Amino acid sequence: LPNYGVFDEFRYFAPGDGLTLFEFGDTLFGVTICEDMWQPGPPATDLALAGAQLIVNISASPFHLLRDREREEMFRTRARDNATFVAFCNTVGGQDELIFDGHSLVIDDEGTVLARGPGFEEALVVIDVDPSSVVARRLTDTRRRALAQDRGDLGPVATIHVGSPHEHTDSVTA
Protein backbone atom coordinates (compact mmCIF):
# COMPACT_ATOMS: atom_id res chain seq x y z
CA LEU A 1 0.00 0.00 0.00
CA PRO A 2 1.24 3.50 -0.70
CA ASN A 3 2.48 5.46 2.27
CA TYR A 4 4.13 8.44 0.61
CA GLY A 5 3.14 11.89 -0.61
CA VAL A 6 -0.56 12.46 -0.03
CA PHE A 7 -1.12 8.80 0.82
CA ASP A 8 -1.12 7.71 4.45
CA GLU A 9 -2.48 4.20 4.09
CA PHE A 10 -0.86 2.81 7.23
CA ARG A 11 -3.19 5.12 9.14
CA TYR A 12 -6.13 2.99 7.94
CA PHE A 13 -4.72 -0.40 6.93
CA ALA A 14 -2.31 -3.00 8.26
CA PRO A 15 -0.64 -5.77 6.27
CA GLY A 16 -2.46 -9.08 6.48
CA ASP A 17 -0.84 -12.18 7.88
CA GLY A 18 -2.61 -14.73 5.70
CA LEU A 19 -4.64 -15.22 2.56
CA THR A 20 -8.40 -14.93 2.29
CA LEU A 21 -10.46 -16.21 -0.61
CA PHE A 22 -14.15 -15.58 -1.12
CA GLU A 23 -16.42 -18.22 -2.60
CA PHE A 24 -19.36 -17.09 -4.72
CA GLY A 25 -21.08 -20.07 -6.32
CA ASP A 26 -18.37 -22.03 -8.11
CA THR A 27 -15.99 -19.07 -8.26
CA LEU A 28 -13.17 -18.32 -5.85
CA PHE A 29 -11.93 -14.74 -5.77
CA GLY A 30 -9.37 -12.74 -3.86
CA VAL A 31 -9.24 -9.03 -3.11
CA THR A 32 -6.23 -6.73 -3.37
CA ILE A 33 -5.96 -3.04 -2.62
CA CYS A 34 -4.40 -0.47 -4.94
CA GLU A 35 -0.65 -0.98 -5.29
CA ASP A 36 -0.86 -4.64 -4.21
CA MET A 37 -0.94 -5.47 -7.92
CA TRP A 38 1.51 -2.91 -9.29
CA GLN A 39 4.33 -5.42 -9.32
CA PRO A 40 4.55 -9.13 -10.11
CA GLY A 41 4.39 -11.51 -7.19
CA PRO A 42 2.49 -11.53 -3.93
CA PRO A 43 -0.20 -11.00 -2.94
CA ALA A 44 -1.78 -11.55 -6.39
CA THR A 45 0.41 -14.55 -7.19
CA ASP A 46 -0.29 -16.15 -3.82
CA LEU A 47 -4.05 -15.64 -4.24
CA ALA A 48 -3.89 -17.28 -7.67
CA LEU A 49 -1.80 -20.18 -6.37
CA ALA A 50 -4.33 -20.63 -3.55
CA GLY A 51 -7.08 -21.05 -6.16
CA ALA A 52 -8.46 -17.58 -6.92
CA GLN A 53 -9.98 -17.52 -10.39
CA LEU A 54 -10.70 -13.79 -10.13
CA ILE A 55 -8.73 -11.07 -8.39
CA VAL A 56 -10.62 -7.90 -7.54
CA ASN A 57 -8.43 -4.82 -7.11
CA ILE A 58 -10.10 -1.90 -5.35
CA SER A 59 -8.20 1.30 -5.90
CA ALA A 60 -8.04 5.06 -5.59
CA SER A 61 -5.47 5.63 -8.30
CA PRO A 62 -5.20 9.33 -9.19
CA PHE A 63 -5.34 10.67 -12.71
CA HIS A 64 -2.15 11.37 -14.64
CA LEU A 65 -2.01 11.82 -18.40
CA LEU A 66 -1.94 8.38 -20.09
CA ARG A 67 -2.11 6.57 -16.72
CA ASP A 68 -5.24 4.69 -17.83
CA ARG A 69 -3.26 3.03 -20.63
CA GLU A 70 -0.39 2.17 -18.28
CA ARG A 71 -2.77 0.63 -15.73
CA GLU A 72 -4.57 -1.34 -18.43
CA GLU A 73 -1.35 -2.88 -19.70
CA MET A 74 -0.20 -3.62 -16.14
CA PHE A 75 -3.47 -5.39 -15.24
CA ARG A 76 -3.49 -7.30 -18.54
CA THR A 77 -0.02 -8.56 -17.65
CA ARG A 78 -1.08 -9.54 -14.11
CA ALA A 79 -4.08 -11.44 -15.50
CA ARG A 80 -1.87 -13.41 -17.91
CA ASP A 81 0.90 -14.00 -15.37
CA ASN A 82 -1.50 -15.34 -12.75
CA ALA A 83 -4.01 -17.03 -15.10
CA THR A 84 -6.84 -15.16 -13.40
CA PHE A 85 -9.59 -12.79 -14.35
CA VAL A 86 -8.91 -9.31 -12.96
CA ALA A 87 -11.52 -6.71 -12.01
CA PHE A 88 -9.91 -3.31 -11.43
CA CYS A 89 -12.36 -0.97 -9.66
CA ASN A 90 -11.10 2.61 -9.46
CA THR A 91 -12.50 5.64 -7.68
CA VAL A 92 -14.04 8.55 -9.57
CA GLY A 93 -14.13 12.16 -8.39
CA GLY A 94 -12.00 14.59 -6.47
CA GLN A 95 -10.51 14.67 -3.01
CA ASP A 96 -8.35 17.57 -1.90
CA GLU A 97 -5.85 18.11 -4.73
CA LEU A 98 -6.36 14.65 -6.28
CA ILE A 99 -8.61 13.69 -9.18
CA PHE A 100 -9.59 10.06 -9.64
CA ASP A 101 -10.44 9.06 -13.19
CA GLY A 102 -12.24 5.73 -12.99
CA HIS A 103 -11.41 3.72 -16.12
CA SER A 104 -12.29 0.48 -14.30
CA LEU A 105 -11.60 -2.77 -16.18
CA VAL A 106 -12.54 -6.42 -16.32
CA ILE A 107 -9.87 -8.58 -17.96
CA ASP A 108 -9.87 -12.30 -18.70
CA ASP A 109 -7.12 -14.77 -17.82
CA GLU A 110 -5.45 -14.27 -21.21
CA GLY A 111 -5.24 -10.49 -20.83
CA THR A 112 -8.19 -9.53 -23.03
CA VAL A 113 -10.22 -6.54 -21.82
CA LEU A 114 -13.84 -7.73 -21.52
CA ALA A 115 -15.38 -4.56 -20.11
CA ARG A 116 -14.25 -1.01 -19.53
CA GLY A 117 -15.75 1.67 -17.33
CA PRO A 118 -15.83 5.26 -18.57
CA GLY A 119 -13.36 7.89 -17.50
CA PHE A 120 -14.34 10.67 -15.10
CA GLU A 121 -17.88 9.48 -14.47
CA GLU A 122 -19.43 6.99 -12.10
CA ALA A 123 -20.62 3.76 -13.65
CA LEU A 124 -21.66 0.28 -12.68
CA VAL A 125 -19.93 -2.22 -14.95
CA VAL A 126 -21.76 -5.55 -15.01
CA ILE A 127 -20.43 -8.52 -16.93
CA ASP A 128 -20.90 -12.28 -16.77
CA VAL A 129 -17.66 -14.24 -16.79
CA ASP A 130 -16.99 -17.96 -16.88
CA PRO A 131 -13.87 -18.65 -14.83
CA SER A 132 -13.78 -22.32 -15.87
CA SER A 133 -11.25 -21.29 -18.54
CA VAL A 134 -8.86 -20.47 -15.70
CA VAL A 135 -8.85 -24.08 -14.53
CA ALA A 136 -8.15 -25.42 -18.02
CA ARG A 137 -5.38 -22.91 -18.66
CA ARG A 138 -3.70 -23.61 -15.33
CA LEU A 139 -3.57 -27.34 -16.02
CA THR A 140 -1.33 -26.73 -19.04
CA ASP A 141 0.75 -23.84 -17.68
CA THR A 142 4.22 -25.15 -16.85
CA ARG A 143 5.26 -21.74 -15.46
CA ARG A 144 2.56 -22.06 -12.81
CA ARG A 145 3.93 -25.39 -11.59
CA ALA A 146 7.41 -23.92 -11.30
CA LEU A 147 6.08 -20.84 -9.51
CA ALA A 148 4.11 -22.95 -7.05
CA GLN A 149 7.25 -24.91 -6.29
CA ASP A 150 9.28 -21.70 -5.81
CA ARG A 151 6.67 -20.09 -3.53
CA GLY A 152 6.39 -23.17 -1.33
CA ASP A 153 3.83 -23.31 1.45
CA LEU A 154 1.43 -20.37 1.34
CA GLY A 155 0.31 -20.93 4.91
CA PRO A 156 -3.31 -21.01 5.99
CA VAL A 157 -5.91 -19.84 3.49
CA ALA A 158 -9.28 -18.72 4.84
CA THR A 159 -12.27 -19.21 2.54
CA ILE A 160 -15.41 -17.18 3.15
CA HIS A 161 -18.68 -18.20 1.49
CA VAL A 162 -20.46 -15.07 0.24
CA GLY A 163 -23.44 -16.62 -1.46
CA SER A 164 -24.35 -18.03 -4.79
CA PRO A 165 -25.67 -16.50 -7.98
CA HIS A 166 -28.74 -18.71 -7.49
CA GLU A 167 -29.51 -17.82 -3.87
CA HIS A 168 -32.28 -15.34 -3.22
CA THR A 169 -32.86 -13.54 0.04
CA ASP A 170 -36.00 -11.86 1.22
CA SER A 171 -35.72 -8.13 1.52
CA VAL A 172 -36.24 -6.63 4.91
CA THR A 173 -37.44 -3.10 5.50
CA ALA A 174 -37.22 -1.30 8.78
Which residue ranges define each predicted feature?
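Enzyme catalytic cores with a strong preference for nitrogen-chemistry domains
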Residues: 1-174
